[in-house]
Regions:
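Metal-dependent phosphoesterase core characteristic of DEDDh/y 3'-5' exonuclease domains
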Residues: 1-96, 105, 267, 275-316, ...
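Conserved DEDDh/DEDDy metal-dependent 3′-5′ exonuclease domain
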Residues: 1-42, 205-281, 377
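Sequence-level motif detector for i,i+2 pairs with an aromatic at +2
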Residues: 26, 150-153, 199
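Acidic catalytic cores of enzymes that act on phosphate-bearing nucleotides/polynucleotides
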Residues: 93, 104-188
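Polar helix-capping/helix-linker motif
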Residues: 95, 104, 224-225, 234-238, ...
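Structured mid-domain segments that build the active-site/substrate or prosthetic-cofactor binding neighborhood
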Residues: 177-223
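C-terminal non-catalytic accessory extensions
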Residues: 324-381
Length: 381
């Protein structure tokens, strides 16, 4: 979530949305799946909180309480960051080999090396898509490359009998992957296929890392060796399956995102030539922004530049530009399209939050400030 907010903020302000993630040796890492892997394979030394149904809870605020980690204000950004670092340190202390393994294999090249669709070599995979009652884990077989996304490999959960999948057509596979269980109805289950995003720090491990688990632990995670091997053998005896699965995942995607503010991903990467022009714009004195004569290859950028000026340097707008901006603001705040919050809905949300009798004085003060901010917009629309 934080990455998405940061990326979009940078993008809308003409900055490179990705540079901070790779320049100067930087990289990204989301440790939640490492926490889940630790629970599944090396839980010793850590207290694992449980939900009412007995399944493990991986909520940060519950992990910190169970392990005596200071976390004074759950969901406060800085407090959450400090607590997350403390949980990572706990795992590094209690299970250093596992910690180092995940850290060293978090990039997409390591993930690619583990997911061999030619041999369908089984891989242990961690994902919130698998139920917590089963440790959020599965032994999967890499079945097919995604037909259009080179950073996505489609895998199959080897716990499940693949007979129906093997006999299904591409259209039937598509229906039983992308249709909700509620819509499929009783007696028809979704096929346990999922995409592994290579560039999103997936947590994968060789199958032999399970060799130290006791029979009781394997049973708890529903990882029966005979079942896994039998299902893998069936997949390998279906030579036409990878092509059918790839076809099923080949869905034309018509983006309904037409507003440049929303088109960080829908519009593709900004070209090097346009990036150089944007960097040049950012270097210009504020008083000259209204006089710049710059054009871009990317059709998003002219409007983004206009909005950048309007939001940050409204004094750079002249004549028709001012009218255009006020018309845009009025439309966005009073009659927004689906997905955007109107000023009226904003006020209603604040009122609903303020009605909470347990709201702290600090949070109530924040809501009052937000209410005043909303009111300050009214004279201009």
């Amino acid at each position: 979530f934080d990455d998405e907010v940061t990326r979009h903020t940078l993008y809308r302000n003409l900055r490179d949305p990705y540079a901070r993630e790779w320049q100067n040796g930087n990289s990204r890492w989301d440790i939640i799946d490492m926490v889940r892997l630790t629970y599944a394979l090396r839980p010793e030394g850590i207290n694992w909180p449980r939900k009412e149904d007995g399944s493990p809870s991986f909520k940060l605020e519950e992990l910190t309480v169970a392990n005596g980690i200071a976390h004074e204000a759950a969901h406060d950004a800085m407090s959450d960051v400090e607590a997350t670092i403390a949980v990572a340190k706990l795992i590094k202390e209690k299970q250093p080999k596992l910690f180092d393994f995940v850290l060293q294999n978090k990039d997409k090249h390591s993930a690619r090396a583990m997911l061999d669709t030619n041999t369908m070599k089984p891989v242990f995979h961690i994902s919130a898509k698998y139920p917590a009652s089963r440790g959020c884990c599965a032994m999967v077989a890499p079945v097919a490359e995604h037909p259009t996304n080179k950073n996505l490999v489609i895998v199959y959960d080897l716990r499940e009998d693949p007979s129906e999948l093997i006999n299904a057509s591409a259209d039937q596979i598509r229906e039983r992957v992308f249709t909700s269980q509620a819509e499929l109805g009783e007696g028809v289950s979704r096929f346990p296929l999922k995409g592994v995003q290579l560039n999103k720090c997936p947590v994968l491990a060789p199958a032999n890392m399970l060799s130290t688990l006791s029979p009781e632990r394997l049973e708890e995670l529903a990882l029966d060796g005979d079942t896994l091997r039998a299902n893998l053998a069936m997949l390998r005896r279906a030579p036409d399956l990878p092509a059918k699965v790839a076809e099923a995942f080949d869905q034309p995607h018509e983006s309904d995102l037409t507003d440049p503010d929303e088109q960080l991903y829908a519009g593709g990467f900004i070209s090097r030539a346009d990036r150089e022009k944007l960097n040049w714009v950012l270097e210009q004195p504020v008083e000259t922004l209204g006089e710049l004569d710059v054009t871009f290859e990317d059709n998003r950028l002219q409007e983004l530049l206009f909005r950048y000026r309007a939001r940050n340097y409204p004094g750079s707008l002249m004549g028709e530009e001012l009218e255009r901006w006020e018309e845009f603001r009025s439309q966005r705040l009073m009659h927004p399209k689906k997905g955007w919050r109107s000023l009226e809905a904003y006020a209603q949300d604040l009122q609903r939050l303020a009605a909470d009798p347990e709201l702290s004085p600090q949070r109530r003060h924040i809501l009052e400030d937000l209410h005043l901010y909303g009111e300050s917009l009214i004279p201009y629309i």
